[in-house]
Regions:
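Hydrophobic transmembrane alpha-helices of secondary-active transporters
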Residues: 22-46, 64, 154-163, 179-203
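Single conserved hydrophobic/aromatic residue that forms the stacking wall/gate
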Residues: 2-13
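Generic transmembrane alpha-helix signature in multi-pass membrane proteins
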Residues: 67-74, 82-87, 94-107, 111-114, ...
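Membrane-embedded alpha-helical segments of transport systems
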Residues: 58-63, 89-91, 110-130, 148-153
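The feature identifies polytopic integral membrane transport proteins across all domains of life
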Residues: 49-56, 77-89, 106-115, 140-143, ...
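Juxtamembrane helix-boundary/capping and inter-helix hinge elements in multi-pass membrane proteins
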Residues: 40, 47-51, 74-79, 100-109, ...
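Membrane-interface helix termini and inter-helical loops of multi-pass transporters
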Residues: 11-17, 43, 71-77, 130-143, ...
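Entry/N-cap segments of selected transmembrane alpha helices
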Residues: 41-71, 81-82, 119, 147, ...
Length: 220
């Protein structure tokens, strides 16, 4: 859905003027996530360590393997394969928490797993991506590590610190965070998609099918 929405919005951004700011926008989203985190979000690590470990293993073992299987099964080209594998090697993000809530699942456990996998991402994702994707594209794990640290980890830590120091003020503005995050994410996807509109138009169906299968199998 994001791809279809952004494909239409891409006409507004024909010059892709947002592309230079994609990293900043991602940082804004991660900072917003950090503002919503507190020590209690990690409490399930101590209360139910086995379940948390299973969730982390599922995220960083099963999801990449599922992505790799789908890439091979559909015979995707190198660039599409790299994109699908990157999705499989990245943490679930807040969307997994939303799905847990809508499905009446264990939201506290989901939040804890999401928080842990996001923090582990700088260490785990580059190595995983190199392992599965180096046969398709050139991968620099060190550069990827620092990129994730700067764009993901540092903004999250900054958000956690601000929340700890100015919690009262944060509570007043946190209600606006979902809207800000949605705007930032749509802007990011729109900028990236509009820059490769022709290529995406050619492969939209297969991308949608593979990503949908990856998500559905993963949520099982």
């Amino acid at each position: 859905r994001d791809c279809l929405l952004s494909r239409g919005l891409g006409d507004v951004y024909k010059r892709q003027f947002l592309l230079p700011y994609v990293s900043i926008l991602l940082g804004v989203v991660m900072f917003g996530m950090g503002l919503t985190l507190s020590p209690k979000d990690f409490s399930e690590v101590f209360h139910r360590p086995i379940q948390v470990i299973i969730g982390i293993v599922g995220q960083f073992v099963l999801m990449p393997l599922i992505a790799f299987f789908l890439v091979k099964a559909f015979g995707l080209s190198a660039d599409l394969a790299a994109g699908v594998l990157l999705v499989g090697c990245c943490p679930g993000g807040t969307s997994s928490n939303v799905m847990s809530y809508l499905g009446k699942g264990d939201v506290p456990l989901s939040v804890t797993i999401t928080s842990c996998t996001t923090i582990l991402a700088p260490l785990v994702t580059p190595g995983l991506f190199w392992l599965f994707a180096h046969q398709y594209i050139e991968v620099d794990p060190a550069a990827m590590f620092w990129s994730i640290v700067k764009i993901v980890l540092l903004p999250i830590i900054g958000g956690v610190v601000v929340n700890a120091l100015f919690g009262t003020v944060v509570k007043k503005v946190v209600v606006a965070l979902p809207l800000i995050s949605v705007f930032a994410i749509i802007s990011i996807v729109t900028a990236v998609v509009s820059a490769s509109a022709e290529r995406i138009a050619e492969t939209a169906l297969i991308i949608f099918l593979v990503v949908a299968l990856h998500n559905c199998i993963g949520y099982l």
